[in-house]
């Protein structure tokens, strides 16, 4: 492979998020549902025989060794003793700190893409275990299927929720995930429910009230758009989203977003666009 290959690095949404327990070690147990979107960043890969990992887009103020894309490539290279190299670029569309998985998705696309084109031969499950050291959400993107997660997020069950259309908006604020989970008003004892029951109920997010109470930018945007649609938080934010049956309905609401707010329209995908492109089996048999 000498030509440049462009691979999708999709966004994800947490369609619901419930916190069921805080353990003695400080970790929170949860129930959440991840789904991919047909919108995201693009990762370019150009594999070569140099043995070097070259980043074509440096992030200002971030050392190469701290860059998740570089770390993912080096991790796979070292783990498999691969002698090949690559030039890697990224076209960013997803907002930083939006809670839609940009950095984790980038790392996963690099792992999956280089494993494919370097022919290093790891299974998706092996790649997911490797990716966990890069971030808790990386295995979600590596496995490539919409998933119901329990525990501290490590127990995954393949799931096929409806593939709706979404409007996703990014309030002009950064939210500290750690601060949200440390907040004394965060619910921590939501009763556990079966997946079948959860799929039949209206979905909410236990973090949303805490975030709306502390960040007026989120509260005001949700309130301003309430006359058009009900938006809710994904993860700990800052992004919010609303669900629609058709692209036309989504476009009609998107037209009412404030001009200074970043946003996009996307369709839910139960199979990652990356895995569709590479024709990788993703749903457990």
Swiss-Prot record:
One MF term in the entry's GO annotations: ATP binding
Gene for this chain: ispE
Highest taxon listed in the record's lineage: Bacteria
Family statement: Belongs to the GHMP kinase family. IspE subfamily.
Annotated positions binding ATP: 95-105
Main function: Catalyzes the phosphorylation of the position 2 hydroxy group of 4-diphosphocytidyl-2C-methyl-D-erythritol.
GO biological process terms, semicolon-separated: isopentenyl diphosphate biosynthetic process, methylerythritol 4-phosphate pathway; terpenoid biosynthetic process
Known catalytic reactions: 4-CDP-2-C-methyl-D-erythritol + ATP = 4-CDP-2-C-methyl-D-erythritol 2-phosphate + ADP + H(+)
Keywords recorded for this protein, A-Z: ATP-binding, Isoprene biosynthesis, Kinase, Nucleotide-binding, Transferase
UniProt-listed InterPro entries: GHMP_kinase_C_dom, GHMP_kinase_C_sf, GHMP_kinase_N_dom, IspE, Ribosomal_Su5_D2-typ_SF, Ribsml_uS5_D2-typ_fold_subgr
Disulfide-bonded cysteines: none
Gene3D superfamilies recorded: 3.30.230.10, GHMP kinase, C-terminal domain
Stored SUPFAM superfamilies: GHMP Kinase, C-terminal domain (SSF55060), Ribosomal protein S5 domain 2-like (SSF54211)
Active-site annotation: 12, 137
Keyword field contains Cell inner membrane: no
PANTHER family: 4-DIPHOSPHOCYTIDYL-2-C-METHYL-D-ERYTHRITOL KINASE, CHLOROPLASTIC (PTHR43527:SF2)
Transmembrane regions listed in the UniProt entry: none
Metabolic or biological pathway, per its Swiss-Prot or TrEMBL entry: Isoprenoid biosynthesis; isopentenyl diphosphate biosynthesis via DXP pathway; isopentenyl diphosphate from 1-deoxy-D-xylulose 5-phosphate: step 3/6
This protein's name: 4-diphosphocytidyl-2-C-methyl-D-erythritol kinase
Species this chain originates from: Actinobacillus pleuropneumoniae serotype 7 (strain AP76)
Documented EC number(s): 2.7.1.148
